[in-house]
Amino acid sequence: MTEFERMLVNSFNAYIEEKGIRAISYRLKQHRFTSQFLDVLVDSLNPDLYLGIECKSISVEKGASALYFSQHFTVDKKGVHQIKRISDYLNKSGRKGFLAVELRRGAGHGREAYLVPWEELEKKYLTQNLKLTLEEIRSFPEIKRDGKDYRINPSEWERK
């Protein structure tokens, strides 16, 4: 589990506990040679919190200018792209999907994170627009920081 994924799971669970919501956030253990559908899952009877989140982290400090679908996502041994696999899973499970993108800006600079609705990502993939630029990523709702943790507030996640 990456630090970003761990922080999201912990932040979701803190929000759930603070609000007294019957829900849980977790990450499935990844087994060797088996694909993992998503990085973070949130289970709740509340449809707004029945979520599947894929996490990606890119280093802006090292010159990354976009999240590329060919570089940052995988293709399985059957030739199925990760975006297609996750889209199928979200459709079958009924979960609301997001891509959480963390922008690492280097030592002394805070990290930023944004939530891209999965439908937006899938639309770009299907139209062969195979990247998200930093400008596009930053146009989506930010997951704001609270110290070193992320502040979970689904009402803030509406499109800017």
Residue spans for each PLM region:
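Short connector loops at helix/strand junctions that flank enzyme active sites
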Residues: 35-37, 46-52, 81, 92-94
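Helix-rich interaction surfaces within compact, conserved domain-sized segments
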Residues: 5-21, 114-160
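Acidic-basic catalytic patches of nuclease active cores, encompassing PD-(D/E)XK
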Residues: 1-36, 43-46
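Histidine- and/or cysteine-centered catalytic micro-motif in compact active-site loops
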Residues: 30, 45, 55-58, 102-104
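Conserved catalytic cores of phosphodiester-cleaving nucleases, focusing on short active-site segments
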Residues: 40-42, 49-62
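Nucleic-acid nuclease catalytic cores
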Residues: 84-121
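Short acidic/glycine-rich loop or secondary-structure boundary segments that cap or lie
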Residues: 35, 61-64, 107-109
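Mg2+/Mn2+-dependent nuclease catalytic core
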Residues: 58-85
